[in-house]
Curated annotation (Swiss-Prot):
The gene is tcpB. Changing residue 202 to A: In strain: Z17561. Residues 351-366 have a biased composition (Polar residues). It comes from the Bacteria. Residues 351-371 are annotated as: Disordered. Involved in TCP pilus biogenesis. This is Toxin coregulated pilus biosynthesis protein B.
Length: 430
């Protein structure tokens, strides 16, 4: 009677293990697909990060909203200093230090201090303009649009007058004339006194960031105490999809901007304009613009950045998996989560056709010979953050000593096995 009861228990355990195996396979396929989809959300983060790069070098000086059409007609309060401060780096100059635009090994940001003015002028970020084209991803049909072009707008202030124009078409045409790739970042100066006219000065994004003297010459040579706008343009091609928060795919008619105060989507700002006589009017419906508040979103009362996900596998046999932490804006902390993607204990030649055939050349037999099949009893993932690196460890419980005649069940614990894969999710949160 005891043997019969034990046999039934084994059969039930084997069936349960088979069901668990199918569930793990299904879960692995699901999470891998989700990871592929969510990885595309990093494109949104990359585009926003490129915009914030220049903002880090900008001062927080207030712009004259009386002469600037964007601030005049589109709620200047959305560009308050407090809303922009989190774009600054944490390791700022201390009080009394003199800001410099030269190389400084003590600063990650070698161009300007957190609260210091740009040495020879002010550069302020307004927003990023996104133009989309219809696109259906072959593997993820729910994604129905891709970025066609991004133009980020900044203002260099030399005097009272200010003007922001649409430089998207000009940037592409000029890039082609000069033999530049349409995918390169271009920075263009816009003449404030002549609508539709653009300065011929064009500098690459890389040169603007990496060459302080070239950047200063670019700003000073063309401006000569005039106030000009900067348009930083990036043309995106290929399988690129935009997602707002790393989990909701953008459909073609989905609004881009997120109102953190209201906790809902809202109409975006625009830099498209019409000039009638001496009056400049902005069309708020033509093009999406992410304002300073659009760089993060509100969820459950917390401010978060878009989620970045990667597909990871333990490779070093028994060692923890290390993953570099993403950079977070000032005031936001790193967050991490991991979900098991796939794991198999069956090995090859597993046979579950009957209660008596429960053998496999699996993980319990080092020499590859037949033996008792390892039954999975549990998986756990743990992670810690040390020096901007996530250390992920895994523990797998295996009932390795089940024998129908001995009545002995000696379990074992497997740590960080090579066969275990998981999806890692990272984001920043206050």
């Amino acid at each position: 009677m005891r043997k019969y009861q034990q046999g039934v228990g084994l059969l039930e355990a084997i069936l349960a293990s088979a069901v668990l195996g199918m569930a793990l396979v299904a879960a692995g396929s699901y999470y891998k697909r989700e990871a592929e989809l969510m990885i595309k959300s990093s494109n949104a983060f990359d585009v926003i990060e490129l915009s914030s790069q220049i903002q880090r070098y900008a001062s927080l000086s207030k712009i004259n909203n009386r002469t600037n059409p964007i601030l005049k007609d589109n709620k200047a309060k959305e560009f308050k200093d407090a809303d922009l401060k989190w774009l600054k780096l944490e390791n700022c100059l201390t009080a009394g230090d003199v800001p410099t635009t030269g190389n400084n090994n003590d600063l990650q940001d070698q161009f300007i201090a957190c609260d210091a003015d740009y040495r020879k002028g002010d550069l302020s970020y307004f927003g990023s303009q996104f133009e989309f084209s219809t696109y259906v991803h072959p593997s993820n049909p729910e994604i129905q649009r891709q970025i066609k072009q991004v133009v980020s707008y900044f203002q260099y202030r030399g005097m009272e007058r200010a003007f922001i124009g649409d430089a998207a078409g000009y940037v592409i045409s000029e890039a082609k004339k000069k033999g530049f790739s349409a995918q390169d970042y271009r920075i263009v100066l816009i003449e404030p006194d002549r609508v539709g006219y653009f300065e011929s000065n064009v500098i690459s994004y890389e040169e603007f960031i990496e060459n302080p003297s070239a950047r200063e010459n670019f700003l000073l040579k063309a401006t000569k105490d005039r106030t000009l706008a900067l348009a930083v343009s990036l043309a995106q091609t290929g399988e690129i999809a935009m997602q707002r928060d790393g989990s909701v795919a953008f459909l073609e008619d989905t609004e881009l901007c997120w109102d953190t105060a209201a906790g809902s989507a809202k109409s975006c700002l625009s830099v498209r304009y019409d000039t009638v006589g001496n009056k400049t009017e902005l069309d708020l419906k033509q093009i999406d613009v992410v304002s300073a508040k659009g760089l993060s979103f509100e969820s459950d009362g917390k401010t978060k950045t878009p989620v970045v996900s990667t597909y990871e596998t333990f490779q070093d046999g028994g060692r923890a998996k290390t993953i570099n932490a993403i950079e977070c804006p000032t005031g936001l902390n790193n967050r991490f989560a991991a979900v098991v993607s796939s794991f198999s204990t069956a090995g090859q030649n597993a046979n579950f056709s009957s209660e008596s055939a429960k053998d496999s050349q699996g993980t319990t037999q080092k020499d590859g010979s037949k033996g008792p099949h390892a039954l999975l009893s549990g998986i756990s993932l743990n992670w810690t953050l040390t020096n901007k690196v996530w250390d992920v460890t895994a523990s797998i419980g295996i009932e390795s000593g089940i024998l129908p005649t001995s009545g002995i069940d000696s379990g074992s614990l497997l740590r960080n096995p090579k066969s275990l894969s998981f999806i890692a999710f990272q984001w920043c949160e206050n």
